[in-house]
UniProtKB/Swiss-Prot annotation:
It comes from Microcystis aeruginosa (strain NIES-843 / IAM M-2473). Mn(2+) 1 binds at residues 33, 57. Keywords: Calvin cycle, Carbohydrate metabolism, Hydrolase, Manganese, Metal-binding. Substrate binds at residues 100-102, 131, 176-178, 198-200. Pathway: Carbohydrate biosynthesis; Calvin cycle. This is D-fructose 1,6-bisphosphatase class 2/sedoheptulose 1,7-bisphosphatase.
Length: 345
């Protein structure tokens, strides 16, 4: 799968990032997202595959493109038989976030990117549009920290695993009222807190790379992005755990569903019989082969944002895989027409 799709999924996120970055700083988050969705879908439909969106822009009646259940790729088209051999075809599940951090793009802030994860059919957890309690940590802490422990306990464990004092640790937390007590506990334990307004996928992945000065992600964010983060962390050998949040009182706002009982019923309909289960990255991204790709829209911890020059643009992307156990940073110059010069730095 990697040998045939690796380069193409990089191009998918590159095109989404370029499209969205043209709306950077214009205050139009919905437009920045919409053009990224269009660009991502158009490029995916040119790939020799039969793909199915398991995490996308929403339910079919809520999203015109890249909705959950939508099929993408050349081999899903009406005349697919002339292009595709069914005996050689691998069906693929896809999780996408064409513009992760729409507010970041709209207001010209750092940390937004276009992301996707793919695996064979059934290899990615089809998370409902709920919230998820998350814990991400470096590979050295995998299996040692635990989402059921307090932040204080996990910081002590993390300190031992990384051979650092707690005062040297940096924990990323979403800047939300629901995290007031968590933030205070982290600070009381002696660690430092980096608050972010959006974009916790980037924060989770950054835990797996030394030199980012991010050592953990804690708190509650969107469940679909949790699956994408888990796919990346599985490729990188990092620690990731997620637990679905189905009680609206926990997050106070924005949760799909009006009641705890209604949300529990919805989970039951989806076949989730243990709503309190803690999922590891091997369960959220359980496929034999998992690929993850991201491209910076605005500058971030791991990647530069899209940089335009006369006649073209330059992007930085990341592609990682469970198969090759590699993390490739890809620097690409895109020539839209005959440029007067090519941007090198």
């Amino acid at each position: 799968m990697e040998s045939t799709l690796g380069l193409e999924i990089i191009e998918v996120v590159e095109q989404a990032a370029i499209a969205s970055s043209k709306w950077m700083g214009k205050g139009e988050k919905n437009t920045a997202d919409h053009v990224a969705v269009e660009a991502m879908r158009e490029r995916m439909n040119k790939i020799h595959m039969r793909g199915r969106i398991v995490i996308g822009e929403g339910e079919r009646d809520e999203a015109p493109m890249l909705y959950i259940g939508e099929e993408v790729g050349i081999c899903t088209q009406v005349d697919a038989k002339q292009y595709c051999n069914p005996d050689e075809l691998v069906e693929i599940d896809i999780a996408v976030d064409p513009c992760e951090g729409t507010n970041l793009v709209a207001y010209g802030q750092n940390g937004s990117m276009a992301v996707l994860a793919i695996s064979e059919k059934g290899g990615l957890f089809a998370a409902p549009d709920f919230y998820m309690k998350k814990l991400a940590a470096p590979p050295a802490a995998k299996g040692h920290v635990d989402i059921n422990k307090s932040a204080t306990e996990n910081l002590k464990v993390l300190s031992d695993c990384l051979n650092r004092s707690i005062e040297e640790l940096v924990v990323v937390v979403m800047d939300r009222p629901r995290h007031k007590e968590l933030i205070q506990e982290i600070r009381n334990a002696g660690a430092r807190v980096r608050l972010i307004s959006d974009g916790d996928v980037s924060a989770a992945i950054s835990c797996a790379f030394s030199g980012t000065n991010i050592h953990a992600l804690m708190g509650i964010g969107a469940a679909p992005e949790g699956v994408i983060s888990a796919a990346a962390m599985r490729c990188l050998g990092g620690h990731f755990q997620g637990q679905l949040i189905y009680d609206p009182e926990v997050v106070k706002t924005g949760l799909i569903g009006e009641s705890r009982e209604g949300n529990l019923a919805r989970l039951q309909e989806m076949g989730i019989t243990n709503p309190d289960r803690v999922y590891g990255c091997e369960e959220l991204a359980s496929g034999e082969t998992v690929l993850f790709a991201a491209c910076g829209i605005t500058p971030g911890t791991l990647m530069e944002g899209v940089r335009f020059f006369h006649g073209g643009a330059r992007t930085q992307s990341l592609v990682i895989s469970t198969q090759s156990k590699t993390a490739r940073f890809v620097d690409t110059v895109h020539l839209f027409d005959r440029p007067k010069y090519i941007q090198l730095r």
